[in-house]
Swiss-Prot record:
UniProt cofactor(s): a divalent metal cation
The gene coding this protein: surE
Molecular function per GO: 3'-nucleotidase activity; 5'-nucleotidase activity; exopolyphosphatase activity; metal ion binding; nucleotide binding
Record protein name field: 5'-nucleotidase SurE
Keywords of the record: Cytoplasm, Hydrolase, Metal-binding, Nucleotide-binding
Protein family: Belongs to the SurE nucleotidase family.
Keyword Membrane on entry: no
Cofactor binding note from Swiss-Prot or TrEMBL: Binds 1 divalent metal cation per subunit.
Localization of this protein: Cytoplasm
Length: 248
């Protein structure tokens, strides 16, 4: 098993080291990740400037001056030979719950892997302490995928509570919850008195009831949410056609 590992926190992040170390027991691991933190990059692809790649001497990781999606795309199509059998993104420093997934570079890296034809997982730790716990579950899931492959149009979005391994209650299969709209934008000034803006923290939980990823984490469980690559709203196709007919 050849495993490509990437993330959005950057090639020097603690989470990607913990993940790659744990997955070496499952197969041959190659790390291709952004050269710096690219959290919130979503599925952006660099098209207008060239991508530069360097190799970190002490661990052999590839550092790409680009986005998480760039990293997976470049790795699969150029850097990693033979091609990987699987893509694992993470361990993210913080949650990717609910509508976090539309912004997450970690989820995007896994999505790019699936788009390119490989089974893919996105692993996030809901905190910044117990990376070993998240790495344990990542390795467990990778071994599971080796035996029972995932459906061709899905990735698994995995969130792990920031707890010691023996305090995690188990695993729950969940749906995405939802946050309130984030309205906080912080305005300040640069040293020259010009206005600058910071996008504030994410909104509070809105849909976090039983069955959601939020609820599973709150209860001390690992949350696993299957995400589909095909974003077509099939249930709306007939209704949309009828709506168009009403327009004359």
């Amino acid at each position: 098993m050849r495993i490509l590992v990437s993330n959005d926190d950057g090639v020097h992040a603690e989470g990607i080291r913990a993940l790659s170390d744990a997955l070496r027991a499952c197969g041959e691991v190659t790390v291709v990740a952004p050269d710096r933190n690219r959290s919130g990059a979503s599925h952006s692809l660099t098209l207008e400037v060239p991508l530069r790649v360097s190799r970190i001497s002490e661990n052999g990781y590839y550092a790409v001056k680009g986005t998480p999606t760039d990293c997976v795309h470049l790795a699969v199509n150029e850097l990693v030979r033979p091609e990987p059998d699987m893509v694992v993104a993470g361990i993210n420093h913080g949650a990717n719950l609910g509508d976090d997934v539309i912004y997450s570079g970690t989820v995007a890296a896994a999505t790019e892997g699936r788009h390119l034809g490989f089974p893919s997982l996105a692993i996030s730790l809901v905190g910044r302490t117990h990376f070993a716990t998240a790495a344990h579950y990542a390795a467990q899931l990778v071994r599971g995928v080796m035996v029972h492959p995932l459906p061709a149009d899905q990735i698994l979005n995995v969130n792990v509570p920031d707890l010691p391994l023996d305090q995690v209650k188990g695993i729950k299969v969940t749906r995405l919850g939802n946050r309130h709209r984030a309205e906080s934008v912080i305005c300040t000034e640069d040293p020259r008195g010009q206005p600058i803006y910071w996008i504030g923290p994410p909104g509070s939980q809105q849909d976090a009831g039983e069955g959601t990823d939020f609820a599973a984490i709150e209860q001390g469980y690992v949350s696993i949410t299957p995400l589909t690559i095909d974003m077509t709203a099939y249930s709306s196709l007939a209704g949309l056609g009828a709506w168009l007919d009403l327009q004359g």
